Amino acid sequence: AVESAVNDHPAIYLPDTSFLLEGQLEKVGFDLVITNPEGVTFVVADYFSYSPPPNLMLSSGPGLSPGLVMAKLHLPFGDDVMFAGPANSANVLEEVGKVTLAIGKVTVKRMGPDGQVEELDVKRGDKLYKGDELVTEGGAFVKARMLDGTRFHLGKNANAILSDYSFDETAKTGNFEVYVIRGGFHYKSGKIGKMFAGLNKNHSTISTPSATIGIRGSELDGNVDEFGSTTIRHTDGYLTITDLNGDNPVVLDTIGNTSIITFNGVPAKFEVASPEQIETLNQNLPPPDTPEELLDEDGDEPGTDEEKVVEEED
């Protein structure tokens, strides 16, 4: 491994963006095998023997962090045993939310009860579980609501992993973490954000191949483009944007169209989003919530969203 383009975290460089944004990952012994859509393979020898494992980078800055690699592999164990033997087939699903709307070809990948990753079509009303990987194809999009009312939406040709979630209203604890590999996305915090109001602490994190977004009681739009660069448009709350390794922080705390775009792995701040940035976001984001969806901020009983959508379609 060599030094990262971002800092001294060890890094191995990928041939091109097809391996970064569209590669299929497989653990073969201690090796990590990445296959791009054309069927070309790239082997990271002894990846699982590194401590820490290297970032898998492009020379322009974006990369796959060890956490993202683990999430893409859907391994039901943590980083502390990532170099261990085969995954335990006893996988307990932990519900984190549900799909409120799915239009077009939307699929989910998750670890099945036999220890193998399964791919399923997604429809309105389906439950979502910790570790689920959502994929939208073509012009498809999907809207999800977590148990606390947090909303997370994905636009066309997008890929994201619901890597971590917890919510205990009685204990006033919770967190939401997601990896977005490509595509447009929208986030709006629910009860977790309200519980953390006034605290100097992030309650949610969105990670991409080029940025990490720390969130406090916020609403935002974002997009990961075909080169792995990330654009964020601030709508509300307090956002801290860093590079892949958590360095070079930039704060977005101005309500309005403040935006950030990452280039060569280092965040840059723009007080006002450019017309080009706005156009790119709007092209890749899912449709905004309807007035009925906006009224339902804190979640509801199962079935309510489905009934609303059916009424809209009739």
Please provide the spans of the model-predicted regions.
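Short intrinsically disordered, low-complexity coil segments enriched in acidic
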Residues: 1-3, 314
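Flexible, surface-exposed loop/linker segments and immediately adjacent secondary-structure boundaries
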Residues: 3-42, 46-138, 142-301
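Beta-propeller domains
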Residues: 296-314
